[in-house]
Each structure stands twice: as C-alpha cells, then as structure tokens.
Amino acid sequence: VGHRITGDRRIQARGIGWEFVHVAVDDASRLAYVEVLPDEGGVTATQFLWRARAWFRRHGIRVRRVLTDNGSGYVSDRFARLCRSAGVRHLRTRPYTPRTNGKAERFIQTLLREWAYRRAYPNSRHRTEALPAWLHYYNWARGHGALHGRPPITCLVAPNNLVAVQS
C-alpha cells in the first residue's frame, strides 16, 4: 500500500504495482481501451496497438492516427512497421510535454484516482481484476464533462441501439 492510499509516504509495500498500464483513448468520443501489461517494450506496445485497433473497430471506430509519447515501445521499429502496414499515421508528443496528449493524460489521472488508488488492493492481481468493471463503468455509465455529462459510448450509437454494441 502506497502513500496515495495511506497518505503517508513512509509506508509502502514492496513488489506491488510494477506493471505497466497501456491506454488508448478515442479523441472524439473519449471511449477508452486499457490493458495492464508486464512491460512497455516494442513487442508489447505493438501487440497492444493491434488489440486496441480491433477493439475500437468492434465499436465502430476506425483508427487513422495514433498519438503516443516517446516511450521506447512507441519509438521502436516494430511499432512503426505496424502503423505503416495498418495505414495508421503515428504522431508523437513533444518530449517532456504531457499536455500535448492532454486527453489521454486526463484519462490516466481519472483511471489512477478512480480505479488504481481508489482502495487498497491486497495485490496487483486483484487490482488488475477490478479493471474491466471500472472500464465498463467509465465507457458506458460515467458522465464525462466534455461530453455534457454523457458517457463516451453515447457518442457512437443511437440511444435505442446500445444493446447491439454491448453484445
């Protein structure tokens, strides 16, 4: 348990929380796709993008551009090759300028506050197991300020067609 839960920086648990959270957020709808993975290398980042593209496609979103930070996995040759072969334009943020990727950074703050640090999990596995339910809540039920209090999924479907997208 870390200081974000206890409020005391002197109290920490060792070995918990060293996974990497990969995040993809649709620019228009704010629909989010998230995976907790063991590293942020080129192979992992490329596989994440592949799965994220498929997930967004199932929700009617065609990925045309990807904006990433300059982490090693996102500047790898493998990641660049996947983007080229998929016809995805890869843009990178300016180094040390997280506001360039503000929508994703804001989502990450929400993710950390409402999921990762919401409570003290007994271990990383329990925290990771709680992610799908929170992500479903975020995409399907949680009101979003930039969307006038509506959840992200409402930008993609007519109100009477939610069952078709969710199944």
Predicted regions and their residues:
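C-terminal domain-tail junction helix/linker
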Residues: 86-88, 110-167
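Short small-residue beta-strand/loop micro-motif enriched in glycine and branched aliphatics
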Residues: 31-35, 91-93, 117
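Short, well-ordered alpha-helical microsegments
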Residues: 75-77
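RNase H-like polynucleotidyl transferase catalytic core
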Residues: 63-70, 85-103, 119-122
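Mobile genetic element proteins and their domesticated derivatives, centered on retroelements
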Residues: 24, 30, 48-49, 66-69, ...
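Active-site beta-loop-alpha junctions of metal-dependent nucleic acid enzymes
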Residues: 10-11, 17-19, 35-60
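Mobile-element integrase/transposase regions
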Residues: 1-25, 31, 47, 163, ...
